[in-house]
Amino acid sequence: MPKILHTARYIGLPLEILKKACPEGFWVKTLDEATPAQLIKEAADADYFLVSGRLPIDKEVLDHAPQLKMIQRTGVGVEMLDIEAIKQRGIPVYVNGGVNAQSVAEHTLALMLSCIKRLPQINHQTHSGIWRKQQTGVTTHELKGKTVALVGMGNIGRIVARMLQAFGAKVI
């Protein structure tokens, strides 16, 4: 039966969900301890890696995974993967591109609004008993009419751009 090695420690409901999602005829092994040593040990008979967390999938791990056929990342980042070593072995890698793009874009906009509205300063002063604008000296601004430069127009960048345009900002 093909083995899917999940490279993180899941317990409780997340583990139940993962096991229910496992295709018939496969079995999922999660790491009891998410350590490099256990990953190397369990990689020996793994057919597939389901990569969560930050354990590196490097040349050493791959050397201990002779029957590895595919790597699936549960998120979008691949910084823990030695892409060059994986390519040399001809192992396909899949990611969940865009899976969290909306959430990250909303968080990005929330941080922008927090900065431009000076929410941390206003919150601190309000909790200190100072709440009148004249007493605080706090000046806030708005996004409307501002020019915002975005670096990268991938899944997240495009959503942030649409949100900023809805606020009346010019995006470059």
Describe these PLM feature segments:
Residues M1, L68, K144-T147:
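Phosphate-coordination loops involved in phosphoryl transfer and adenosine-cofactor binding
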Residues F26, I91, A169:
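Short phosphate-binding/catalytic loops that engage adenosine nucleotides
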